[in-house]
A protein has these predicted regions:
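A detector for small-residue-rich transmembrane helices and their helix-helix packing motifs
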Residues: 1-139
């Protein structure tokens, strides 16, 4: 049995976020800092910010959405393409912050919402007639 990339992303994000929420140094090191990307060439932050979340609610909703939609999307495309989509969307989502806050030493952001939103949008394009239930009961 092969574990899916979606499950691996959820596990990695959950573990790293859990650790970072109690370790401010790790949280700071992984957060997106457009200033540090631009001036210190810390390019890794374009992707590392997807592994940390502001709080447990933020983490839960991103992981819930990624797990719910990601498994279906990944099932119908090669794993490498799904990985490229996720990483590409994460990078693309940072562009406005990089442009607007590249010289602001105080601005930081965290979370995988940009990448998760891309997975959700792709799900909607792939399965346009799929019925989504809110809170598992409301269509």
């Amino acid at each position: 049995m092969q574990i899916s990339l979606t499950v691996l992303l959820c596990l990695a994000t959950g573990i790293v976020s859990w650790q970072a929420l109690s370790n401010s140094e790790l949280f700071s090191k992984l957060s997106l800092s457009p200033y540090r990307v631009k001036h210190n060439k810390e390019i890794y932050r374009i992707w590392s910010h997807t592994l940390v979340h502001a709080d447990m609610g933020h983490l839960f909703f991103n992981l819930f959405a990624l797990f719910s939609f990601g498994r279906a999307v990944e099932h119908y495309m090669p794993t490498a393409l799904f990985a490229l989509l996720y990483l590409g969307a994460a990078a693309f989502a940072t562009l406005p912050a990089l442009k607007k806050h590249g010289d602001n030493i105080y601005y930081t952001s965290v979370g995988a919402s940009g990448a998760v939103s891309a997975v959700m949008m792709l799900y909607m394009f792939m399965f346009p007639t799929s019925e989504l239930l809110f809170f598992f009961i409301l269509p």
